[in-house]
Design a protein with these regions (language model features):
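Acidic, surface-exposed loops and disordered segments
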Residues: 1-224
Length: 224
């Protein structure tokens, strides 16, 4: 698959087949992704790859805390979007599509809660990649570089027939990740990537998102 086709094909997969993803395939993906650019070749990323019993324990731990009413405590602060902004509207538009595909009425709190829990379970993917960085690098310094390696992981996964979903809900309770995945306190947990073979019969995987026309977000200077 060429690069342009991969970029256009990539989408967030929220439903997966139970088939396991081999360590060998995941290792190949990370080998390629590690070629992503970073400031002065600092490579400020670390990967914790989860599967099997450990991933199941993390799912259960996340859901137990969520159901208990425990407040999320992410180490990478996730901020919302201004209510009247175009950014918030884009998010709302996507949520409407997903809820329609999943047959979740706006007023059905039980179904909405069930959908929310999927994110805390890494969308039931057979594997997940946790991205972390060294705490000595500060809050925002390495984020651009980590964004580059995330995109590269997602694009490379397509070569192996895999789907991905970049998500933060799975990292909302870092103490659960540290307990089962043994991520040291010296590392700041940034984000997760659910990864596996897409279940194309899962309704949410049929969602199609739009992109703002380039003319609306680009200023050309010095061109005829």
């Amino acid at each position: 698959m060429d690069v342009i086709k991969a970029v256009k094909k990539r989408k967030s997969i929220r439903g997966y087949k139970p088939d396991p993803v081999s360590k060998e395939v995941l290792e190949q993906i990370l080998e390629v992704a590690s070629q992503a650019p970073s400031a002065m070749n600092t490579q400020p990323w670390e990967f914790t790859v989860l599967s099997g019993e450990v991933l199941e324990n993390i799912r259960k731990g996340n859901i137990e805390l969520l159901n208990s009413g425990a407040l999320p405590n992410p180490e990478h602060v996730v901020t919302g979007w201004p209510r009247e902004s175009v950014y918030r509207q884009r998010q709302v538009n996507l949520a409407k599509q997903l809820f329609q595909l999943m047959d979740i009425p706006r007023e059905d709190r039980e179904k909405r809660a069930k959908w929310l829990r999927r994110g805390f379970r890494f969308f039931d993917a057979p594997a997940a990649i946790i991205l972390s960085t060294d705490c000595c690098l500060g809050e925002s310094g390495p984020l651009l570089d980590i964004g580059a390696v995330i995109q590269t992981i997602c694009l490379t996964a397509l070569h192996f027939g895999l789907g991905t979903c970049i998500e933060d809900q799975g990292t909302m309770y870092p103490k659960i990740l540290r307990k089962y995945a043994h991520i040291p306190e010296s590392k700041r947990i940034v984000v997760a990537i659910a990864i596996g073979y897409p279940d194309w019969d899962f309704p949410a995987n049929k969602v199609e998102t739009e992109r703002e026309p380039i003319k609306n977000v680009t200023t050309w200077i010095g061109f005829d």
